[in-house]
Amino acid sequence: MEDSVFTKIIKGEIPCYKIYEDDKTLAFLDIAPEVMGHTLVVPKNQVDKIYELPDEDYVAVMATVKKLAQQMEKVLGKRPIMKVIGVDVPHAHVHVMPFSPEWKDGVTLEPSEAEMKAMQEKLAF
């Protein structure tokens, strides 16, 4: 299987705005966010569909999603929402985003590097 863009990020071949990492998962800001703080949680084990993950990796992804959601609510003061879509990148992942009334599903922002770094500093744990 060819490395996905997420595997290349995990390997350090492509830079990212890292929020959290452990031995099984990586969480980083989406570079085309729907809202500021839009974060992706990916397993380090590359599989196409989230339901193809071994149970241990699936549980690790969901544990990271939970930690990230708690951090997001604490730091940003907004209730997070999660989406599992599974069609845009052939590597299982979960979108975690702070909910905002002005959010429009599918509309992306173009934040500056300074805005991305500032959000990374707020959310990183």
Regions found by a protein language model. Give the residues of each.
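HIT superfamily nucleotide-processing domains
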Residues: 1-125
